[in-house]
């Protein structure tokens, strides 16, 4: 398949997923209206904050976490190969690439995109919040996990920044000694 044909194929599947998202969104709005007798007019700020944290956690779970790697790899071409390091130690490496084109390639791209998965996650969280009263417990649980995940991301960023400052200080000290 030529590269132009592959690009056209991917554009087609991207369009299909965009239309599908709009259909799901409109369908969800009609479903909410029929279940609740109308559309919600307001969300308490604390509930919106918890929904945002739940959306953040679902997004990280799908896009980044090791526990869902098996699902992401369903839509990827994975190859294992071994390599010998300079020390003679054998290392097994895994190469993960999207399939050439088609639906699986598009789904792979979607699963690698935190912004894309974030929109789908937000849609699911909001619909569940307004339609299913029991979902509040799940949203709360995901929000707590999201807060923990966010704290970990911030702690990692602070640690990396501190390490960079330490390395810069050591480099300046070395330069002064010369």
Q: What is the role of each PLM region?
A:
Residues 1-9:
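Short, Lys/Arg-rich, polar N-terminal cytosolic tail immediately upstream
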Residues 8-55, 128-130:
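Long, highly hydrophobic alpha-helical transmembrane signal-anchor segments
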Residues 45-71:
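Hydrophobic alpha-helical membrane-embedded segments
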Residues 55-57, 144-153:
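Alpha-helical transmembrane segments and their membrane-interface exit regions
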Residues 63-75, 156-164:
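Juxtamembrane/interfacial segments flanking transmembrane helices
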Residues 78-111:
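Short membrane-interface loop/juxtamembrane segments of multi-pass integral membrane proteins
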Residues 79, 161-177:
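Short, highly charged, low-complexity non-transmembrane loops/tails of multi-pass membrane proteins
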Residues 119-129:
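Hydrophobic, membrane-inserted alpha-helices
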């Amino acid at each position: 398949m030529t590269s132009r044909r592959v690009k056209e194929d991917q554009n087609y599947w991207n369009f299909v997923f965009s239309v599908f998202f709009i259909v799901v969104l409109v369908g969800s709005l009609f479903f909410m209206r029929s279940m609740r007798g109308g559309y919600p007019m307001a969300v308490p700020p604390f509930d919106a904050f918890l929904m945002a944290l739940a959306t953040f956690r679902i997004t990280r779970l799908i896009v980044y976490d090791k526990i869902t790697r098996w699902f992401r790899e369903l839509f990827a071409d994975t190859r294992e190969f071994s390599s010998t390091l300079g020390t003679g130690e054998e290392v097994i490496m895994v190469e993960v690439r999207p399939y050439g084109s088609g639906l699986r390639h598009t789904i792979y791209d979607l699963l690698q995109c935190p912004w894309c998965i974030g929109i789908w996650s937000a849609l699911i969280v909001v619909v569940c919040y307004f339609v299913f009263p029991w979902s509040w417990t799940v949203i709360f649980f995901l929000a707590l996990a999201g807060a923990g995940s966010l704290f970990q991301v911030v702690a990692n960023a602070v640690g990396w920044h501190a390490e960079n400052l330490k390395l810069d200080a050591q480099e300046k000290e070395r330069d002064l000694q010369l």
